[in-house]
Amino acid sequence: MLYKGDTLYLDWLEDGIAELVFDAPGSVNKLDTATVASLGQALEVLEKQHDLKGLLLRSNKAAFIVGADITEFLSLFLVPEEQLSQWLHFANSVFNRLEDLPVPTLAAVNGYALGGGCECVLATDYRLATPDLRIGLPETKLGIMPGFGGSVRLPRMLGADSALEIIAAGKDVGAEHALKIGLVDGVVKQEKLIEGAIAVLRQAITGDLDWRAKRQPKLEPLKLSKIEAAMSFTIAKGMVAQTAGKHYPAPMTAVKTIEAAARFGREEALNLENKSFVPLAHTNEARALVGIFLNDQYVKGKAKKLTKDIETPKQAAVLGAGIMGGGIAYQSAWKGVPVIMKDINDKSLNLGMTEAAKLLNKQLERGKIDGLKLAGVISTIHPTLDYAGFDRVDVVVEAVVENPKVKKAVLAETEQKVRPETVLASNTSTIPIGELASALERPENFCGMHFFNPVHRMPLVEIIRGEKSSDETIAKVVAWASKMGKTPIVVNDCPGFFVNRVLFPYFAGFSQLLRDGADFRKVDKVMEKQFGWPMGPAYLLDVVGIDTAHHAQAVMAAGFPQRMQKEYRDAIDALFDASRFGQKNGLGFWRYKEDSKGKPKKEEDAAVDDLLASVSQTKRDFSDDEIIARMMIPMINEVVRCLEEGIIASPAEADMALVYGLGFPPFHGGAFRWLDTQGSAKYLDMAQQYQHLGPLYEVPEGLRNKARHNEPYYPPVEPARPVGSLKTA
């Protein structure tokens, strides 16, 4: 053994070939600060071996290196810019030493090589991969850019266009594509990986492969003519401006850095990467996006812990076909859980099966599946008008009309047709689970399971724990949701649960703005372009359905009369009374026509202004800041109340539910991350200016306490250790 660290070791393999093996404790390798330091120490040993002929890098895990240790990011990003820059210089000196070894080097890459893992293998001369490879640089999705030389080496290896596509979009690619673009040099089966790697190294050692020529382009300026450079970078900047926009600075910074570094060799180019990375790491966007990643890990870990002793349901059923039922059935079948889809008429069943078939055909068109797989999946969805097969079902989700009487009747009937241990769930969006449970003999086997539309795209499923829901019931439904590829978040019961409970105060803020003379078009524009929502409130209401929102608004008002009962006729009432139900019938706040792809495209409709005139005062202009404040304060206050009342268990779960269920702008990180970034005291000062607008604008006492004591909702993060100590393992 030449060197043994906590996460890697170095040893002789054969004939002057050494192997550096990443083998961290636990299930995966991460390129954390300790591993970078350990790699430097291993290279120091290696540099003294005069009989060294070649170096093989490999992993003892199912994945090569999954990336940097993102749990370290928030503390690293808190160190002063100069110290962070120094540490990056140190880390890059380690990878430069790997790249500068006087012998050929090869990385045998299995599974994932992402972020720092990818940057590590870019420093080797050759890369051999297994068919399950996923390799790429996802840093821009975290609000930063590659910092270990990825933005320098990748363009010089692949050419500007392919590298820009991967770096700016934060993409990873599979083995076949990586081979095509030159990111790896060969693909071999896992059992042949080491044998193949040694064979390539031997060819390089004997001179049959010119490893020096392979290495040289990574050390030089990017080989692009002025015209080629202008075309590549102009196109890339245009694409990034269109897709990322102003709220996500990292992709544009990465493109501009690669452009600026193109005319320099490795050392100068790395200095430019360093100068661009450090300011990005100190942005609110980076903290928010890293926070989302960590919250996602927390939520998934919580679900895994909850279901560790639970067997995933093997047979499911959906009550109520149609678009929603068909979407749920598709998702379950697609992920391997057969499903019975029951309805009371053939028309609805046909609609549900058509929806499932449409979604599968899209997978076929994209090349994700073949005809055989499509037929196999669709055959596991069994449409029926009766309860045949329900005695074999492990879990049933009811997705009928949003009417408590109908839902109670359907659930009570179904309870008599299933085994005593079968779990029943309701896909209600607003009706309290306790109310629906009153119709059941076994309420402990019942809970809520709120999917979001469209089911196949929306990652969140709200799991609602009723007063009598058992832990086993919750665990079974969480297990099914996880199996479906969804992110389940458990909340406690109340009208609207968590997501809709906080959404309708936001809509109420919108209605009050229109009542006071705001133009809905400007409100939409400000909330989309300035705050960053994917849709403004008017557009969102049209997509949800004005009729659906009108009904839900009444349910929420009955549940929370003190705050959500309104004493005036609002825009939603006016549109509902005029049968303008939104996208579903082509008329809402906007008029909708199908585009060439059959998707609804919104257009202005002057007729809506006459309708809204009856429920609004004389038009007046509002500043962007006032619109944002009046829209967001009711939502933020309600989110805080939900945490204080125990409806949602933690700021992390609340923020993930908002991002995954409502599209809360990820660069803000969620409501609690946004609050912490603003500071509770600053938020309180802003909110107090609008308290005269009613109870929805009254700040909860818990938040006032946070403001008084200057306390954040997330635990404070301590800066990383001094840079000098990070240079040792």
Swiss-Prot record:
Residues 1-189 are annotated as: Enoyl-CoA hydratase/isomerase. GO terms for biological process: fatty acid beta-oxidation. Residues 311-729 are annotated as: 3-hydroxyacyl-CoA dehydrogenase. Substrate binds at D296, N500, Y660. One of its GO terms (cellular component) is fatty acid beta-oxidation multienzyme complex. GO terms for molecular function: 3-hydroxybutyryl-CoA epimerase activity; delta(3)-delta(2)-enoyl-CoA isomerase activity; enoyl-CoA hydratase activity; long-chain-3-hydroxyacyl-CoA dehydrogenase activity; NAD+ binding. Residues 708-729 are annotated as: Disordered. Pfam families: 3HCDH, 3HCDH_N, ECH_1. Its EC number is 4.2.1.17, 5.1.2.3, 5.3.3.8, 1.1.1.35. The record marks E119, E139 as: Important for catalytic activity. The active site is at H450 (for 3-hydroxyacyl-coa dehydrogenase activity). Pathway: Lipid metabolism; fatty acid beta-oxidation. Keywords: Fatty acid metabolism, Isomerase, Lipid degradation, Lipid metabolism, Lyase, Multifunctional enzyme, NAD, Oxidoreductase. Coiled coil: none annotated. InterPro entries: 3-OHacyl-CoA_DH_CS, 3-OHacyl-CoA_DH_NAD-bd, 3HC_DH_C, 6-PGluconate_DH-like_C_sf, ClpP/crotonase-like_dom_sf, Enoyl-CoA_hyd/isom_CS, Enoyl-CoA_hydra/iso, FA_oxidation_alpha_subunit. It catalyses: a (3S)-3-hydroxyacyl-CoA + NAD(+) = a 3-oxoacyl-CoA + NADH + H(+); a (3S)-3-hydroxyacyl-CoA = a (2E)-enoyl-CoA + H2O; a 4-saturated-(3S)-3-hydroxyacyl-CoA = a (3E)-enoyl-CoA + H2O; (3S)-3-hydroxybutanoyl-CoA = (3R)-3-hydroxybutanoyl-CoA. It comes from the Bacteria. CDD domains: crotonase-like (cd06558). PANTHER family: TRIFUNCTIONAL ENZYME SUBUNIT ALPHA (PTHR43612), TRIFUNCTIONAL ENZYME SUBUNIT ALPHA, MITOCHONDRIAL (PTHR43612:SF3). NCBIfam families: FadB (TIGR02437), PRK11730.1 (NF008727). Involved in the aerobic and anaerobic degradation of long-chain fatty acids via beta-oxidation cycle. Catalyzes the formation of 3-oxoacyl-CoA from enoyl-CoA via L-3-hydroxyacyl-CoA. It can also use D-3-hydroxyacyl-CoA and cis-3-enoyl-CoA as substrate. Heterotetramer of two alpha chains (FadB) and two beta chains (FadA). In the N-terminal section; belongs to the enoyl-CoA hydratase/isomerase family. This is Fatty acid oxidation complex subunit alpha. It comes from Salmonella gallinarum (strain 287/91 / NCTC 13346). The gene is fadB.
